[in-house]
Amino acid sequence: MFTFEHIITDSENNHHEVDFHLTNDSFGITCTAPFSLTHQVLSGGKQQGSELLTLTQGDMTIRFVPTRAMAILDVVVAGTRFGWDSSVKEVVNPAFINQEAFGGLGWLEGFNEMVVRCGYQWAGHPGVDGEEMLTLHGRIQNTPASFVKLTVDQSPPHNITLSARVDEKCFKRSDFEVWMHVSVAPGENKLVIRDELINRGDYEREYQVIYHNNFGTPVLDAGGQLHVPAKSVSPFNEYAKQGLASWDSIDPPRKGFDEMVFNVFPISDEQGNTTAVLHNAQANKGVAVGYNTSQLPVLTIWKNLDTPKQGYVVGIEPGTSFAYNRRYQRALGLVPTIGANESREFDVSFTFLMNEQQVASQVADVICLQHTTLLSLDDEPLVTLPS
């Protein structure tokens, strides 16, 4: 298929475009769903120098942060925002983040996006693994993209793909190259992520990745519901035990609510495809997160039902691993390896549900998958953490 391409950033050729506005007219395309891509350099506070790419197609607007590993800040569909309200209000430039701060929790100083990639040398909670001190959720999210490109199909329906390359390289440690592709098709309330991890080094390496996908109001509200086809669900730690019976229901915001995390072993179809759905109390707004269990075999549900100011949010997080520190997950078989010059693909999709019929259809698909297996609620965490 023939495509139009526009390179935005290319570190190898010292090329970078700023403050531009492209439209379908820029490519000589006439279409029923006009599109545009706008670039901004942000100013002030810790967002000084951060960059924002805003892609609009029809009634969908997606904001990307190339300075922060092409994170998706939020998505707006027909006036409904999908994302969440963090106490971190700025789009923080990684130059101002010390990931070693707060006992390895410095990553949280920039955490406010809808889609955050955690990895790739490690993901999960901070702590010592062997002789290494691992910070929260790895380093990729605080790495700017080295290459960014817009691609538009010449032929209808003129699918749009925003691609980026983010490198995770450290002498004697890793030589990872991550290609990130996000595609949208006109007329669909859906975006599709296809990422590729490549080990450019000469040695086999461990890797981990978690897609930390986060949703707040209006999709999240009291009386809302999670629908996740699962073989088993267990509490992450002792605190989460008290919420196990209601792991899939949404309570109102509550001051003093500490995060509750649940480990899920999902059910998939014969091709490995599965979906998790979150919808509001009226079941007329929601989101369906699709992924493949051959690539991302486990799911973490993160419930942070704190006050709206502090962060009223639920995470639907498919990954190669749970959120435990890497040292605990080898025994679970959840620290995969990638050989020299090998690659791994990860596919994640987001379908934005805008009415009762769309919500009901996605929930029915989940129920159909669950019908094949009896869900087990396991009382004990998979890992015994130090008190």
For each predicted feature, which ranges?
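Surface-exposed acidic/polar loop and edge beta-strand patches at domain peripheries
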Residues: M1-V192, E204, F215-P252, I267-S387
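Histidine-centered active-site/metal-ligand motif
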Residues: H212
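Mid-to-C-terminal polyanion-binding domains and interfaces
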Residues: D258
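Flexible, substrate/cofactor-facing loop regions flanked by secondary structure
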Residues: V264
